[in-house]
Amino acid sequence: MTINNENLIWIDLEMTGLNSEIHRIIEIATVITDTKLNIISEGPVIAIHQKEEHIVIMDEWNTKIHKKNGLIKRVQKSIYNESKAESKTIFFLKKWVPIQSSPICGNSVYQDRKFLARYMPNLENYFHYRCIDVSTIKELVNRWCPSFKKIKKQNHTALEDIHESIIELNFYKKIFFDTIKYSK
C-alpha cells in the first residue's frame, strides 16, 4: 500500500435519476489505478439507504434496471446514509491518493460530480478540479472513427461500470494513444 499522487481515482455513482436537485445517490464505488490503468485497489462498494419517497420517484428506466440488478433491495436494507458512505470512501482514498491530486475518472463524471457536490461535498473536494471522462473520448470516436466503437455491457452497478470504464479507456489508449510516436 503506497500513497502516490500519480494514482487515479475512478468513481461511479448510481442515482435515482439525473437531476441532483431532486434525485439521490443509491450506490457508490471507487477503484484506484496507476497511470497505465492497472488496478491497484478496489474501494468499498456501498448501497446507500434512501427513504421510500426517493425510491418511488425513479423513472421507469432506473426502476427496471435497479430492480433487475438487485440494487433497490440493497438500498432498502443498507445501514449507510450519504455521510457514512462519503466517510468510508474518503478513508479508503487516503491510503492511495493525496487530496486534490487525482482527477475524477470514469464515464460522464460531470454528472457524478454534480451529485457529489450536493450530497457528498467532502468527497467532491477530494478530487482535483480536472477530470478524465471516458465518455468524451467515446463520443469523439463514435463521430470520427465509428468502426472503433466499443460496446459496453451496461449492467449499471457502480463497480462493474468502473471496470468497464477502465477497460474502455484502455481500449482507446491502445488504439489511439499508444500508437502515437512523439519526441520531446
Curated annotation (Swiss-Prot):
Residues 8-169 form the Exonuclease domain. The keyword Cytoplasm applies. Keywords: Cytoplasm, Exonuclease, Hydrolase, Nuclease. The keyword Signal does not apply. The active site is at Y129. GO terms for biological process: DNA metabolic process. GO terms for cellular component: cytoplasm. It is found in: Cytoplasm. Pfam families: RNase_T. Its EC number is 3.1.15.-. 3'-to-5' exoribonuclease specific for small oligoribonucleotides. This is Oligoribonuclease. It comes from Buchnera aphidicola subsp. Schizaphis graminum (strain Sg). The gene is orn.
